[in-house]
Swiss-Prot record:
UniProt-recorded name of the protein: UPF0149 protein PP_5201
Superkingdom to which the source organism belongs: Bacteria
Entry GO CC: cytosol
InterPro entries on file: YgfB-like (IPR011978), YgfB-like_sf (IPR036255)
Family per record: Belongs to the UPF0149 family.
Protein source organism: Pseudomonas putida (strain ATCC 47054 / DSM 6125 / CFBP 8728 / NCIMB 11950 / KT2440)
NCBIfam families: PRK02166.1
Gene3D superfamilies: YgfB uncharacterised protein family UPF0149, PF03695 (1.20.120.740)
Length: 184
C-alpha cells in the first residue's frame, strides 16, 4: 500500500484537489529542466512556465507549494552536493506507477529545458544527457515487476539524480569569482 503521507502523494493530492491535471513528477522535471537551462530562480517566471502545465491559474496553496519546490531545487542545484532528490512516488508504490512517474519527470525536464535553453551551444556530453532523457521518457512502460525491473528502475533513477547537474554546470551555474591577486 503506497505511503499516503509521502511528499509526492501530498503534492499529487494538492494538485488534483485544485483541478490541475499534472503530476508532481512532471512539474518537478519541468522546474529542474528550466533551471538547468539557465532560466534562473525568479519565482514569477517559474510560475508562468508551470501555469502552462497546470491549465488553470493556481490558487494560493498551489502557488506556495510551487515556490517552496523552487526554493528546494535552488538549494540542491547550488549546493556542493552532487545529486538532486527526484520528486517521485515512494518505493512501496507499484513499479509501473514509479516508472510512469519517472517518464513524466523526464518529459517535464525536456520541456522545461527546451523552453529555456534558447539555442545555446551544448557539449557532446550535454547532448547525450538530453538524448537519454528523451529516451527514458518514452520507455516508461518497459519495466516489469521483477527484481530485474526494480534494479533497472533504481539504476535509471540514480542516473537522473546526477545527469542534470552536468547541464546545470554547463549552462546555468554562476561562474566562480576570480581569485583576487595576492599582494607580495
Amino acid at each position: 500500500m503506497p505511503n499516503t503521507q509521502s511528499p509526492y502523494n501530498a503534492f499529487a493530492m494538492l494538485l488534483s484537489s485544485n483541478g490541475h491535471p499534472v503530476t508532481p513528477a512532471e512539474l518537478h522535471g519541468l522546474l529542474i529542466g528550466r533551471s538547468c537551462a539557465g532560466a534562473g530562480f525568479d519565482a514569477d517566471a517559474w510560475l508562468a512556465d508551470a501555469a502552462q502545465l497546470l491549465e488553470i491559474e493556481p490558487g494560493d496553496s498551489v502557488r506556495n507549494a510551487l515556490v517552496g519546490l523552487q526554493e528546494m531545487v535552488k538549494g540542491e542545484l547550488t549546493s556542493d552536493d552532487m545529486a538532486i532528490v527526484l520528486l517521485l512516488p515512494t518505493d512501496d508504490a507499484a513499479l509501473s506507477d514509479r516508472a510512469t512517474a519517472l517518464g513524466q519527470w523526464c518529459q517535464g525536464f525536456v520541456t522545461g529545458f527546451g523552453l529555456n535553453a534558447g539555442g545555446k551551444d551544448l557539449s557532446d556530453e550535454a547532448k547525450e544527457v538530453l538524448q537519454d532523457l528523451v529516451a527514458i521518457s518514452q520507455v516508461q512502460e518497459a519495466l516489469e515487476e521483477s527484481e530485474d525491473g526494480e534494479s533497472d528502475y533504481m539504476e535509471v533513477m540514480e542516473y537522473l539524480r546526477v545527469a542534470p547537474l552536468l547541464l546545470f554546470s554547463e549552462l546555468a551555474k554562476p561562474a566562480a569569482p576570480a581569485p583576487k591577486p595576492s599582494l607580495h
